[in-house]
Amino acid sequence: MDSSDRIIADSIHATSIQIQIDADLGQVVMLRAVAETVALIAGFTVDEVADTRVALDEAATCLILGAIPDSQLHCDVVADSFRIRIEVGAVCGDTDPIDTAGFGWHVMHSITDHLTADHDPYDRAQGGYPVAIAFTQVRRVH
């Protein structure tokens, strides 16, 4: 848990949800809908919600394309009135399915305030490499 997680976890009004879907591009719409709803409930503007949706779409698509067959994508969303943090994870067939020099990563980096990618060693029980992308978007005070 990094400092932004602790700040959100300590908030009295934090909203948290976990969702698991099949690692299938057709399921990304469900993730977008959940994240959008959480962000709207937390009081983010329509533009901020759109940025969150785009970042989540890029992260989920990247991991789904690298996921092993018949696997699941996990998504954790935590939000309060100041920020939203989303972590998406999947078991991938490659050690590093994330192209940090690619356009999608550049987009995520541009529209979020904090972006990380974690790669774990091969997990024999899961049959692949656990990979996660996490990002935080801070609500802008207008």
Q: What do these predicted ranges mean?
A:
Residues 1-54:
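Bergerat-fold GHKL ATPase/HATPase_c domain
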Residues 1-18, 62-142:
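Conserved beta-strand-loop-beta-strand hairpin that lines the nucleotide-binding pocket
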Residues 46-70:
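Conserved ATP-binding N-box helix of the HATPase_c
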